[in-house]
Structures are given as structure tokens and as C-alpha cells.
């Protein structure tokens, strides 16, 4: 039997650990840490995600404000709102919900949001600190993967790890976090010619390729740890599936994350943790 790495359970633990930190912050500074979310347009899925983030904030005692902008919002108008949030001392974390309407530049957003308030840890400034080994916060999804490994006491030090995917959101920061945990890391991508050969040598494989059901049993060695970051609505019967053919892992992998219920729940939990951490850092050092 493959051990199911339950991200919902780990996320619950992370949220519970934040409750006393939020309460202490309130007691000390007279307000709760605040996450401000900016959403542009009427994408239904995005609005559901934003609503879930607000609910998650409120459940642990944080506050969340949602800035809902019409689809025709100009780049200048969006930039003005982000600048205002950057300069608002009552705002600790800023999150811009992607995707943006096509006429808006995500590049501009990633340049403009202050690293000191970047709750996602994905702006260019934030990633600069991160890759220099001086992170203000870590990108949410890779940090969530590390929390899962920690929760289940899965050893990383000295292990061979492969990360499939090289995005700034998951792949590259994931490789760095594993390296800092003293794993020997190989980063694979769409141009890797011998990917299956490499993944079959790994003790731990993190798959963030963005391609549904890309890897299966034949791509992993016996008793490997498999972390599936992918999420797609193209599974059998329209069900959610990941980048890994999960049903093939039973009796082969030692442990694996399911989709849904694996890495996904960790992303919001780490967003809350990042916001709390940024609030604490800003409160300790007003010049931060």
C-alpha cells in the first residue's frame, strides 16, 4: 500500500499553528495581520479561489480585503491600486489573483508589488532575495511541499531528488529548497531527453510539469516518494487529476500525494503563513 500524503491534514496543522501567532500579533499591535487580494474581471474560478482565501484568513483571525476591479481596468489603474497597497501600513500581504485579462501585464505586477508585502513570494524582487539565500518568504507551493515532507518525517538530506518542471512558481524554487535541505537535485524539463531514466534513479520526485498524467509507474523506482503538484480537469469523467497516473503507484511507490487533496490545500495554508510572517517582520522593523 502506498502511503497517502494528506495535504488537507498538513494544511490544517499549519493553520492551527498560526492561530496563537495571529492572537499575539493582535494583542501586541492592536490589529490582525491583513492580506489584500486584487482580482480583475469576472473569471468564476478566480473568484472562488479568492473567496476561499478570504474565508481561510478569517478562520484563523486574520483579516482579508478583496479589491474587485472590472475587466476593463487599465494597467495604469491597476498600478495605482498596487502602489497604494504598498504604502498602506495596515496591509501586510498583497496577492494579485492570476490570470489577468489579456490587456494587462503580469510582468508589471511582478515588478511593482513590494517584496516586503509579497504574500505569494513570486515577485521578481522576492525571488531575487529567495535565490540569493535571503528569503523574506518562500513561494507558497514549494514551501507547502517541504511542509508535507516534514510532517511525514520523510528524510531529504543525502537523497537523490528530481524536480520535473522549471517554472519560477514551482520548479526552480522547489529545486533550491531541496538543495538547501541537502538533497542532490536534478531539474528536468520539456527538453530533457532522458527524463524517465533520471526519475527512475530518484528517491524523491516532485512533478510540476503542467501536463496531465504525464508520468506513471514505469517512471519511478520501487519505493520512491512521489509529489504531484499538477492539477487538471481532464481526468476520467472530467475528474481532477495530476501530472502523475496516481492509480499506478499503489504497491510501487512508498508514498505519494493524491490529486486533489495533496499539494493543493497547502498553497493557501502557506499563503496565510507568509502573510503572518511578513506582518511580524514589518512590525519588528518599521523600515522593513
Curated annotation (Swiss-Prot):
InterPro entries: Aminoacid_DH-like_N_sf, NAD(P)-bd_dom_sf, THF_DH/CycHdrlase, THF_DH/CycHdrlase_cat_dom, THF_DH/CycHdrlase_CS, THF_DH/CycHdrlase_NAD-bd_dom. NADP(+) binds at residues 165-167, 190. Its EC number is 1.5.1.5, 3.5.4.9. PROSITE patterns: THF_DHG_CYH_2 (PS00767). It comes from the Bacteria. It catalyses: (6R)-5,10-methylene-5,6,7,8-tetrahydrofolate + NADP(+) = (6R)-5,10-methenyltetrahydrofolate + NADPH; (6R)-5,10-methenyltetrahydrofolate + H2O = (6R)-10-formyltetrahydrofolate + H(+). GO terms for biological process: L-histidine biosynthetic process; methionine biosynthetic process; purine nucleotide biosynthetic process; tetrahydrofolate interconversion. Keywords: Amino-acid biosynthesis, Histidine biosynthesis, Hydrolase, Methionine biosynthesis, Multifunctional enzyme, NADP, One-carbon metabolism, Oxidoreductase, Purine biosynthesis. GO terms for cellular component: cytosol. One of its GO terms (molecular function) is methenyltetrahydrofolate cyclohydrolase activity. Pathway: One-carbon metabolism; tetrahydrofolate interconversion. Transmembrane segments: none annotated. Catalyzes the oxidation of 5,10-methylenetetrahydrofolate to 5,10-methenyltetrahydrofolate and then the hydrolysis of 5,10-methenyltetrahydrofolate to 10-formyltetrahydrofolate. Belongs to the tetrahydrofolate dehydrogenase/cyclohydrolase family. Homodimer. This is Bifunctional protein FolD.
Amino acid at each position: 500500500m502506498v502511503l497517502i500524503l494528506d495535504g488537507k491534514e498538513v494544511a490544517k496543522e499549519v493553520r492551527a499553528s498560526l492561530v496563537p501567532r495571529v492572537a499575539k500579533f493582535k494583542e501586541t499591535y492592536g490589529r490582525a495581520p491583513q492580506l489584500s487580494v486584487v482580482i480583475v474581471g469576472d473569471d468564476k474560478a478566480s473568484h472562488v479561489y479568492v473567496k476561499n482565501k478570504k474565508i481561510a484568513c478569517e478562520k484563523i483571525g486574520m483579516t482579508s480585503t478583496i479589491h474587485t476591479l472590472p475587466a476593463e481596468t487599465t494597467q495604469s489603474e491597476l498600478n495605482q491600486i498596487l502602489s497604494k497597497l504598498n504604502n498602506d501600513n495596515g496591509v501586510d500581504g498583497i496577492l494579485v489573483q492570476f490570470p489577468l485579462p489579456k490587456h494587462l501585464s503580469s510582468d508589471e505586477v511582478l515588478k511593482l508589488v513590494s517584496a516586503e508585502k509579497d504574500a505569494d513570494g513570486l515577485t521578481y524582487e522576492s525571488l531575487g532575495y529567495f535565490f540569493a539565500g535571503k528569503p523574506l518568504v518562500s513561494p507558497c507551493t514549494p514551501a507547502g511541499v517541504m511542509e508535507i515532507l516534514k510532517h511525514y518525517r520523510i528524510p531529504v538530506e543525502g537523497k537523490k531528488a528530481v524536480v520535473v518542471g522549471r517554472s519560477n512558481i514551482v520548479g526552480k524554487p522547489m529545486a533550491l529548497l531541496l538543495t538547501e535541505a541537502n538533497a542532490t537535485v536534478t531539474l528536468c524539463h520539456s527538453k530533457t531527453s532522458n527524463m524517465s531514466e533520471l526519475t527512475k534513479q530518484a528517491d524523491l520526485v516532485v512533478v510540476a510539469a503542467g501536463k496531465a498524467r504525464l508520468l506513471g509507474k514505469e517512471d519511478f523506482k520501487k519505493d520512491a516518494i512521489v509529489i504531484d503538484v499538477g492539477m487538471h480537469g481532464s481526468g476520467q469523467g472530467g475528474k481532477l487529476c495530476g501530472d502523475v497516473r496516481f492509480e499506478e503507484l499503489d504497491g510501487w511507490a512508498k508514498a505519494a500525494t493524491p490529486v486533489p487533496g495533496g499539494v493543493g490545500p497547502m498553497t493557501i495554508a502557506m499563503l496565510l503563513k507568509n502573510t503572518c510572517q511578513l506582518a511580524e517582520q514589518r512590525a519588528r522593523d518599521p523600515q522593513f
